[in-house]
Amino acid sequence: MTNIEKLFAFFDSENQRDWQTYQTFLSDHVSWELEGDTTEIIKGKTGYLTKIQKAYHNNPVQFRCTYYQLSPDQNRIVTILENDFGDLSCDIFFFEKDLIVKEIEYLLKKAD
């Protein structure tokens, strides 16, 4: 499975709230940098899973990837994601040894 295929499977498992599958795409030492009004850095698989599960608790929102671009080595993937409300983010995923080791997420637009 290529990194882009893994990323789309990762997105699918997030939308399905299949945390068992979701966590298999993450390195134990993954970091997630969330850039909004402030910067938050979440480190480690456990912290990442805790943060994402809290965000989706009792929240049925789904998202889709509207654009992506791969680096020549396919280890970096830039995405534009849009949720059901029209909120946008630019997320950059970094892969090492077939796992996501870093995500930088820029919150771009809140729906009106």
Identify the role of each PLM range.
Residues 9-10:
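Generic hydrophobic alpha-helical segments
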Residues 33, 51-112:
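A beta-strand edge to alpha-helix "cap/lid" segment located at domain peripheries
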Residues 2-5:
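Alpha-helix N-cap/N′ positions at the starts of helices
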